[in-house]
Amino acid sequence: STVSSETSSTVASGESAASGSYTGTPIKVGGIGPITGAAATYGNAVKNAEELAVKEINAANGSDVFDWKFEDDEHDAEKSVNAYNSLKDWGMQVLAGPVTTTPTLAVAAESVNDNMFVMTPSASAQTVIETGDNVFQICFTDPNQGVASADYIAENALATKIGVIYDSSDAYSSGIYAKFKTEIGRASCRE
């Protein structure tokens, strides 16, 4: 199931360019993420942040700079591509998402053909930005998190023996673990 949220779709008019207000047709921004299912916590956080940002920017401008629509992908790559295509049909010009890595990789592969600007706020696999020149990543990558964790433990002498519990079937968890395992060897810790 696809859940959509949309701001009003009015064309701003009557404002002069000298006033500093945007007076053109609103820019259509799409969002994709899991707002239902196991990863809904992440998707809802991003959805709420995007919605708030659009409302605040439009309010500060006095007219609609952005139209925004968000689609639920349930953290599923195929549903994310379907959501992407639905947003393209809506007229999306910029994609703020997807939220999680696996759906982002699937959508990024599609977006290259369309030269759609894609900016994920939270998909953290290092391979996300390798899909095309149109795909950007705002957050830290999985390897960055593994390095930071290992550095923190080593710098603060927190342990000499470490056990790691991670989900080998999850790209996010595995990515952090792989880099952590490599980096923790610099310390006197044993995994």
Which role does the model predict for each range below?
Residues 17, 41-46, 60-127, 138:
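Beta-alpha junction/loop-to-helix N-cap segments that form part of ligand/metal-binding clefts
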Residues 35, 135-190:
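An alpha-beta-alpha
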Residues 47-68, 182, 186-188:
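Signal peptide-proximal N-terminal region
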